[in-house]
Each structure stands twice: as C-alpha cells, then as structure tokens.
Amino acid sequence: MKKVLLSAAMATAFFGMAAANAADTNVGGGQVNFFGKVTDVSCTVSVNGQGSDANVYLSPVTLTEVKAAAADTYLKPKSFTIDVSDCQAADGTKQDDVSKLGVNWTGGNLLAGATAKQQGYLANTEAAGAQNIQLVLSTDNATALTNKIIPGDSTQPKAAGDASAVQDGARFTYYVGYATSTPTTVTTGVVNSYATYEITYQ
C-alpha cells in the first residue's frame, strides 16, 4: 500500500515538473536517490506472512502503565517473525544450510541524539503523535531490554533461526515494544516508526 501511494505521488510530482518545463526550461533541479545491492544468494522472505515489507501492530499502552514503569522499561512487546526460505545461488544452486542464515538490522528512524540506554530507540515518525516515547527492537520480551537491538550496530544480538518452522529455511522471531527514558513526560497519541533489515547467508 505505501509503495503504491509513493509511486502515485512521484508520478504526480514528475508530471507537474514536465508541465512547468513547458513554460520555462530552467526551473531548477534536484537529486533522486536509488538503493540496490548485488548478492550471490537470493531467498524468499516473509515478515508475519506479508512479504519482505510488512506492518506490525502493537497493543496500545496507557499513560498509567507508562508512568508506573521505571525509565527504559520494555512495555507491551509484540512478537513478529521473519521467515526465510528457498535460498539459491546466482547459478540456481540450492543453498540449504540454514545454519548460515541470519537477519541483520541495518537502520531505521533512530532517535536523534540518543545516549546511553536510548541507543537503538526508534523515534516516532508522527510529529503530531505521542511525545517522548519510542519503539525498540529486541530478540526477546524481557522488560529489562537486555537483548535490545541497535540497528546498524555490528554487535547487535541475533535471533536464532528455527529450521523446524519453515520448509527449506528458518524462522527468526523478534519483538518490538515501547520504551521511554522520561515516563512522566509522555503524552497520548499514535506511535509509529520503522526499521530496515537484510538477510545474510554466510
């Protein structure tokens, strides 16, 4: 859904630029960023059964629950799964050693200026949403966030793949939940964010 809307918006933007150029050929310019990668192994990936891109919906957390918890407590963690299967090399050779599979969190909407325990916190993308509360990834649901994931950090904890859950592949289970370093300053509203990942075979 988001990709379709973005494509429609881009088409509109380019159409508007073409119309302007008909009247004035010197109207400025800009930069378009493209991202890609060449790999020697490809796999089928499904997050919560939705494909490689997905939405994960958390249960709401109340202000009472937030303010009753200590700072940086993991609140209402929600589990989600990443299934990886049918890996093949560039020449079509099946790559079926699931012990080589892994998930690496590469980035996201990280909280700007984060220090200490806030490292890895994913900032709210909704400017008019809840304030002073973030989302956090982890490999478990422990309230102490002992296995917090910092996207982009090479030392991030890794979820173990469950080969019994996916044919010719493995299932990786992760959690996402709320956290805040300042519980008393949190306000009500929507909390949305995102993180990016890549599948590794090594």
UniProtKB/Swiss-Prot annotation:
Disulfide bonds: C43-C87
Biological processes, Gene Ontology terms: cell adhesion involved in single-species biofilm formation
GO cellular component: pilus
Compartments in which it is found: Fimbrium
Transmembrane segments: none
Signal sequence segment: 1-22
Keyword terms of this UniProt record: Disulfide bond, Fimbrium, Signal
Record Pfam families: Fimbrial (PF00419)
Annotated family: Belongs to the fimbrial protein family.
Protein name in UniProt: Fimbrial subunit type 3
Organism name: Klebsiella pneumoniae
Gene: mrkA
